[in-house]
Swiss-Prot record:
The gene is ilvD. One of its GO terms (biological process) is isoleucine biosynthetic process. Its cofactor is [2Fe-2S] cluster; Mg(2+). It comes from Methylococcus capsulatus (strain ATCC 33009 / NCIMB 11132 / Bath). Pfam families: ILV_EDD_C, ILVD_EDD_N. This is Dihydroxy-acid dehydratase.
Length: 562
């Protein structure tokens, strides 16, 4: 051990005559006398039967505990919550999704700090688990390793691979009479074969990859199938590794530096990852005290190409990426090209460059990950837009398949449900820009994901014919010409609030502008006439969240400026 106390926190709970009552309680949960001399490691499990993403994590928590106990520590498993974006999508319940990120962070911080654990293994599955866990680990700043619960295997129907987004898009296809009820039911029944997180480069897999690039999970952790021996071993190794980090005195904020976040952004771009990564990385950096801004995504995005042909915009699933080696070969390619900071420390106790020294190349002939000289897109698909509709920024996901600009006629909706109805009943036509507002962090509240409307657009065959902009968010499964995270949001008086049906809007990825074709004077007149709507909630967690949450451009966090 170092010259630091080997049990800096648990010793305050269990050492000495006066702590006998605490020891008595712990005897009841399985502590032997000898265990009180061991470092206590909390295993933060997100297990629940709420969602397939997390239904197996109780077993993974036991695997991690075995690693801790075998390494000379004492593991204590506890639970935090999860919700399912995929199940609640398109409902009022989706307003709680981003809120759950904060609840997860707060609850892990609460348990670990209250119980005096010396280190943490956090295991996450569904989308908000990952940033929620990392925010907590950053706040606590105790030796920690994050473990991703793993990706789901693809479903299959009529020889075609399926995932949850296939079902969302089938709803639009059914509404457009392109398939019948029997086909919709067949897709529904075969899309989700078992445990694991949604299978494309959607938000869960994006954030798991970002966290591996950040250095907070063991090499390979992000690209493993949920039910596999590799994932069991990943958990065991994580449990053992936390004890080594305790010995080294290496803490999360030593790892999660500005350069480490730049590495995470680089890998997210190369993989074609979710727009949610922007929001979550900003929030995670905030918890670390790292000054990360939207402009950093633009700066890095100008030099990093999109290389991965992964769903939702591409052809392949995460499970197929696992088969060719995961993200380690990609990271080695990026490092060799000077696009990653190799000197960043990681939870292995080694630098990123040291971790990647023996990383293999992808097998010859694979077409899932392109070479740097043959990218899918020469720069980032995550485009930060500004302009008179988004003075403080917005996030677009533009792979180039949709084109690089879109000008159309505004069709304005004050909630997601109204927009979805208009899409499904045929009101939305070629050339429209669907505007969904009052769905931001404060106005929703909760910044719902718009997967139902965007999937309906795709299912109706309008993916290249219409655009959608919102102060809400998008699922990692969204593709098409979409812009989210518009800031300031409509509820706080952002220009989105004064857009009218029939206005002309331009989205331009090359000039990085989101523009309302109305004069500044007219915008001023409309804003002067605008009044803020009454809050949708005045009691409960959504009311609290709306009062506390920061803008999307700052990560939508709830502990700033207190």
């Amino acid at each position: 051990m170092t010259d630091k106390h080997p049990r800096p926190h648990s010793s305050q709970v269990v050492d000495g005559m006066e702590r006998a009552p605490s020891r008595a309680m712990l005897h009841a949960v399985g502590f032997a006398d000898a265990d009180f001399a061991k470092p206590q490691i909390g295993i933060a499990s997100t297990w629940a039967m709420v969602t397939p993403c997390n239904m197996h994590i109780n077993k993974l928590a036991e695997d991690a505990a075995r690693g801790v106990d075998g390494g000379g520590g004492k593991a204590v498993i506890f639970n935090t919550i999860t919700i399912s974006d995929g199940i609640s999508m398109g409902t009022e319940g989706m307003k709680y999704s981003l809120v759950s990120r904060e609840v997860i962070a707060d609850s892990i911080e609460t348990v670990v700090a209250c119980q005096g654990y010396d280190g943490v293994v956090a295991i996450g599955g569904c989308d908000k688990n990952m940033p929620g866990c990392l925010i907590a680990l950053a706040r606590l700043n105790r030796p920690a390793v994050f473990v991703y619960g793993g990706t789901i295997l693809p479903g299959c129907h009529d020889g075609k691979k399926l995932d949850v987004v296939s079902v969302f898009e089938a709803v639009g296809a059914r509404a457009n009479h392109r398939i019948d009820d029997a086909e919709l039911h067949a897709i529904e029944s075969n899309a989700i074969p078992g445990p694991g997180s949604c299978g494309g480069m959607y938000t869960a897999n994006t954030m798991a990859s970002a966290i591996e690039a950040l250095g907070m999970s063991l090499p390979g952790s992000s690209a493993q199938v949920a039910i596999s021996r590799a994932k069991e071993l990943d958990c065991e190794r994580a449990g053992a590794q936390v004890l080594k980090l305790l010995d080294l005195g290496l803490k999360p904020r030593d790892i999660m530096t500005k350069k480490a976040f730049e590495n995470a952004i680089t890998v997210v771009i190369a993989l074609g990852g979710s727009t949610n990564a922007v929001l979550h990385l900003l929030a995670m950096a905030n918890a670390c005290g790292v000054d990360l801004k939207l402009d950093d995504f633009t700066r890095i995005g100008r030099k990093v190409p999109m290389l991965a042909d992964l769903k939702p915009s591409g052809r392949y699933s995460m499970a197929e990426l696992v088969e060719i080696g995961g993200i380690q070969p990609l990271m080695k390619t990026l490092l060799d090209a000077g696009l990653l900071h190799g000197d960043c420390m990681t939870v292995t106790g080694k630098t990123l460059e040291e971790n990647l020294a023996d990383a293999p190349d992808y097998p010859a002939g694979q077409d899932m990950i392109r070479s740097l000289d043959n990218p899918i897109k020469k720069d980032s698909h995550l485009v930060i837009l500004k302009g008179n509709l988004a003075p403080e920024g917005a996030v677009a996901k533009i792979t180039g398949k949709e084109g690089l600009s879109f000008t159309g006629t505004a069709r304005v909706f004050d909630c997601e449900e109204a927009a979805l109805t208009a899409i499904l009943d045929g009101t939305i036509v070629k050339g429209d820009v669907i505007v969904i507002r009052y769905e931001g962090p404060k106005g929703g509240p909760g910044m719902r994901e718009m997967l139902s409307p965007t999937s309906a657009v795709m299912g109706k065959g309008l993916g290249k014919e219409v655009a959608l902009i919102t102060d809400g968010r998008f699922s990692g499964g969204t593709h098409g010409f979409v812009v989210g995270h518009i800031t300031p949001e409509a509820y706080t008086g952002g220009p989105l609030a004064i857009v009218r049906d029939g206005d002309t809007i331009t989205i331009d990825a090359e000039t990085r502008e989101l523009s309302l074709h109305v004069t500044d004077d007219e915008i001023g007149r409309r804003l002067a006439q605008w009044t803020q709507p009454a809050p949708r909630y005045t009691k409960g967690v959504l009311a609290k969240y709306a009062r506390l949450v920061s803008p999307a451009s700052e990560g939508a966090v709830t502990d700033d400026g207190l």
